[in-house]
Amino acid sequence: MARTQAEPPASQPDARAAWLRDQLERANYAYYVLDQPDLPDAEYDRLFRELQQLETDHPELVTPDSPTQRVGGEAAGGFTPVVHDAPMLSLNNGFADEDIVAFDKRVADALAKTTDLAGSVTDPVEYACELKFDGLAISLRYEQGVFVQAATRGDGTTGEDVTENVRTIRSIPLKLKGKHVPAVLDVRGEVLMFKRDFARLNERQRAAEQREFANPRNAAAGSLRQLDSKITAQRPLSFFAYGIGVLDGMPMPDTHSALLDWYESLGLPVNRERAVVHGAEGLLDFFRKVGEKRESLPYDIDGVVYKVNRRDEQERLGFVSRAPRFALAHKFPAQEALTKLVAIDVQVGRTGAITPVARLEPVFVGGATVTNATLHNEDEVRRKDIRIGDTVIVRRAGDVIPEVVGALLDRRPADAAEFVMPTECPVCGSKIERLPDEAIARCTGGLFCPAQRKQALWHFAQRRALDIDGLGEKIIDQLVELNLVRTPADLFNLGFATLAELDRFAEKSAQNLIDSLEKAKHTTLARFIYGLGIRHVGESTAKDLAKHFGSLTPIMDASIEELLEVNDVGPIVAESLHQFFAEEHNRTVIEQLRAPGKVTWPEGPPAPKAPQGVLAGKTVVLTGTLPNLTRDAAKEMLEAAGAKVAGSVSKKTDYVVAGAEAGSKLAKAEELGIPVLDEDGLHQLLEGNTP
């Protein structure tokens, strides 16, 4: 939804109020009618509070259609309007502890004034505390215990009839339990989608190549407002009851907590994360406890709700135009907020991964001030169309690294600049490469790059590489931070006196590490190659390289085509090896490691090239006695041709060579349909002919 109107300054209250009303109404329309929210909740709350304050300071600016005078958006087309018998009001919000203390004081003072002891000190107020679900508010109507209608909140007075869709939600009873049910009951509650159900729904959307939902709230809202209830029936929606509209034929429970207990006895789903507390201290304690378990809950919440527990006290407190005086929503720090993206830098990870990072104007989100946020990778920046200068949505949930969710395209300045991935590492200057079919670009600096230094040293020292006992991560951290070690070659220059001065490093530990370094100087070529930490080169590949080439220099000088001749080395591994050894920095470090008095290993001649004939890689079984060849001679000839000689017949056998008195192996081959050859057939294979 475009917001093209220029933003007036606070010094023009008339124009500012009109602009705020316009922004909020557009957001309401996108949120409630289109189900396409384009403004983060925190930004909406900020604009709403500003308009409230402006209208308080300038009462003449209040208009009948101001968003402060009603709850939400109008009913959308396609559904029958439903007028609520009792309004579905929203709640006022609190954010800081001070807001909660002030709410409790207002309630206590108001209750005191309505008693005979006006103004006197009373006992702490009793409150019912619940979770604030991130879903869609609805009203369920039961007549004589039978479900007859469901309606969305809409604008609080008129909603939309979604009865047929709600019938598909299995947690909602179509008939209330018990013999004594009211003549009419309007149940207020929330339709939502559990996290696990949301994940499964998006899996199905991906499999069907359909658009995925952004979050569980959007999925729940979109599912509930489907014109075809068959689609809703396929969506895993849930419901929790938390309030009441109309009750006829039975007395109203005395307290809100008793209402929820009664709902449970009727078979209505009520959330168990609730409590009855006293005073502001009890409210804040409940909030903190819920906050600690928030991330582990199976559904999304954005705060908690406090309600004066006693029904008679609720009635005495009454309502303001938009919300009840007896209730408050205590919201968690916003998980999303708007700010300006001022630059995009790249960060080099411990394995050389290049990550674009957004530099932001400071914004408070998720309980902390955020100035940087991840953009993940180059493809994500392109997909989200994020540019320098954009107004962006930043998300921070719990301990998760802040990320840029997207940009508000209608606020994009004319000079917004696209991100360009650098070609050289900003830390070491080495070439940045991105392999085919990979989302992550990487610095090829390897051993030389300071950003990768600690990881490279740790890998070089681990047991399956140079096996430097006593060189753990904490020691490596100190060595790097004190600038004592820059590359693996520097490890072998360390002396006893230097090591003994390290924090928490006794003389015995220093001597043990010196001994380990001396021992590590004598290794194998395979261990050395593995210790270099070349991407995609594991122990097995390192052994294959050492066996194939025999020495290090031919590996370093090999072309991609020559590397592809090595057993189990494919295009990705060959490209990674070639890039690593093409970097002059890496070759320099290797030469330093091979200097006199440093690392040595035995070298040998390259292995004979593997046969490429028709028998290469085939499995052959010998059975019986051949006329002219002994079994050992036949085996040597087959292995020289690249075949593997097995001792038993299976589905993996390619040929069976059978002589006199072949026995059970021949029978098994015939049973499995495996080709059986005599000695002449064997010679044809050895000569490169397929029999």
Curated annotation (Swiss-Prot):
<keyword id="KW-0464">Manganese</keyword>
<dbReference type="Pfam" id="PF01653">
    <property type="entry name" value="DNA_ligase_aden"/>
</dbReference>
<dbReference type="InterPro" id="IPR033136">
    <property type="entry name" value="DNA_ligase_CS"/>
</dbReference>
<dbReference type="Pfam" id="PF22745">
    <property type="entry name" value="Nlig-Ia"/>
</dbReference>
<dbReference type="InterPro" id="IPR018239">
    <property type="entry name" value="DNA_ligase_AS"/>
</dbReference>
<feature type="binding site">
    <location>
        <position position="449"/>
    </location>
    <ligand>
        <name>Zn(2+)</name>
    </ligand>
</feature>
<protein>
    <recommendedName>
        <fullName>DNA ligase</fullName>
        <ecNumber>6.5.1.2</ecNumber>
    </recommendedName>
</protein>
<dbReference type="InterPro" id="IPR004149">
    <property type="entry name" value="Znf_DNAligase_C4"/>
</dbReference>
<dbReference type="Pfam" id="PF12826">
    <property type="entry name" value="HHH_2"/>
</dbReference>
<feature type="binding site">
    <location>
        <begin position="90"/>
        <end position="91"/>
    </location>
    <ligand>
        <name>NAD(+)</name>
    </ligand>
</feature>
<dbReference type="Pfam" id="PF03120">
    <property type="entry name" value="DNA_ligase_OB"/>
</dbReference>
<keyword id="KW-0436">Ligase</keyword>
<comment type="function">
    <text>DNA ligase that catalyzes the formation of phosphodiester linkages between 5'-phosphoryl and 3'-hydroxyl groups in double-stranded DNA using NAD as a coenzyme and as the energy source for the reaction. It is essential for DNA replication and repair of damaged DNA.</text>
</comment>
<keyword id="KW-0234">DNA repair</keyword>
<feature type="domain" description="BRCT">
    <location>
        <begin position="610"/>
        <end position="691"/>
    </location>
</feature>
<dbReference type="InterPro" id="IPR041663">
    <property type="entry name" value="DisA/LigA_HHH"/>
</dbReference>
<keyword id="KW-0460">Magnesium</keyword>
<keyword id="KW-0862">Zinc</keyword>
<feature type="binding site">
    <location>
        <position position="307"/>
    </location>
    <ligand>
        <name>NAD(+)</name>
    </ligand>
</feature>
<keyword id="KW-0227">DNA damage</keyword>
<feature type="binding site">
    <location>
        <begin position="41"/>
        <end position="45"/>
    </location>
    <ligand>
        <name>NAD(+)</name>
    </ligand>
</feature>
<feature type="binding site">
    <location>
        <position position="425"/>
    </location>
    <ligand>
        <name>Zn(2+)</name>
    </ligand>
</feature>
<dbReference type="InterPro" id="IPR003583">
    <property type="entry name" value="Hlx-hairpin-Hlx_DNA-bd_motif"/>
</dbReference>
<dbReference type="GO" id="GO:0003677">
    <property type="term" value="F:DNA binding"/>
</dbReference>
<feature type="binding site">
    <location>
        <position position="443"/>
    </location>
    <ligand>
        <name>Zn(2+)</name>
    </ligand>
</feature>
<feature type="active site" description="N6-AMP-lysine intermediate">
    <location>
        <position position="132"/>
    </location>
</feature>
<dbReference type="InterPro" id="IPR004150">
    <property type="entry name" value="NAD_DNA_ligase_OB"/>
</dbReference>
<dbReference type="GO" id="GO:0003911">
    <property type="term" value="F:DNA ligase (NAD+) activity"/>
</dbReference>
<dbReference type="GO" id="GO:0005829">
    <property type="term" value="C:cytosol"/>
</dbReference>
<dbReference type="InterPro" id="IPR013839">
    <property type="entry name" value="DNAligase_adenylation"/>
</dbReference>
<keyword id="KW-0479">Metal-binding</keyword>
<dbReference type="InterPro" id="IPR010994">
    <property type="entry name" value="RuvA_2-like"/>
</dbReference>
<dbReference type="GO" id="GO:0006281">
    <property type="term" value="P:DNA repair"/>
</dbReference>
<feature type="binding site">
    <location>
        <position position="153"/>
    </location>
    <ligand>
        <name>NAD(+)</name>
    </ligand>
</feature>
<feature type="binding site">
    <location>
        <position position="190"/>
    </location>
    <ligand>
        <name>NAD(+)</name>
    </ligand>
</feature>
<dbReference type="InterPro" id="IPR013840">
    <property type="entry name" value="DNAligase_N"/>
</dbReference>
<feature type="binding site">
    <location>
        <position position="428"/>
    </location>
    <ligand>
        <name>Zn(2+)</name>
    </ligand>
</feature>
<dbReference type="InterPro" id="IPR012340">
    <property type="entry name" value="NA-bd_OB-fold"/>
</dbReference>
<dbReference type="GO" id="GO:0046872">
    <property type="term" value="F:metal ion binding"/>
</dbReference>
<dbReference type="InterPro" id="IPR001357">
    <property type="entry name" value="BRCT_dom"/>
</dbReference>
<dbReference type="Pfam" id="PF00533">
    <property type="entry name" value="BRCT"/>
</dbReference>
<dbReference type="InterPro" id="IPR001679">
    <property type="entry name" value="DNA_ligase"/>
</dbReference>
